[in-house]
Amino acid sequence: MIQTPVIVTFANQKGGVGKTTLCITFANYLVTKGARVVVIDCDFHHSIMKCRKADIRKYGEQEMPYEVWAYEANDKAMMTSLMEKLHNDPEIEVVLMDSPGSLKAEGQIPMFVNSDIIIVQFHYDLVTVPSTASFLMFVERLKKAVGERMKARLFIIPNLND
């Protein structure tokens, strides 16, 4: 039996690989299957939150298919508190987290450690592949450093390939 909520983080230190797009696409899919979803926008650009605000301006305050919360990934203590809150919320089945395209945000440590699934998108080019490899090495070092506290399953997904 899967324990809910399931926290899925879309991550890569390389920007432009499709983290935000895949996060929203997955949120929309899960909602059509009846899941109670919350999207946490931790990307520095807060693109998901900006789109949600634009939707509200255009369509009004009608019921949205899922909530979007914006958080800064720079604050480690705040992110630790958020992850604890999410893990203890019985109203949520799936949390989708859009992480920043950088490893400079200290809040990413508790984000990754407390995720159930980390999805790493990349595309095949001379810049993205080495950057993604570096990110994957970071995740492996983090797993070794925190031990069994980090139970996240890692999925590596090629994106934007022909």
Q: Can you describe what each PLM-predicted range is?
A:
Residues 8:
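Conserved beta-strand position immediately N-terminal to the Walker
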Residues 38, 100-162:
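Conserved catalytic-core segment of NTP-binding enzymes
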Residues 5:
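Short coil/loop residues immediately preceding or within conserved phosphate-binding loops
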Residues 21-22:
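Hydrophobic positions on the alpha1 helix immediately C-terminal to the Walker A/P-loop
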Residues 2, 11-13, 17, 28-102, ...:
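P-loop/Walker-type NTP enzyme "switch/lid" segment
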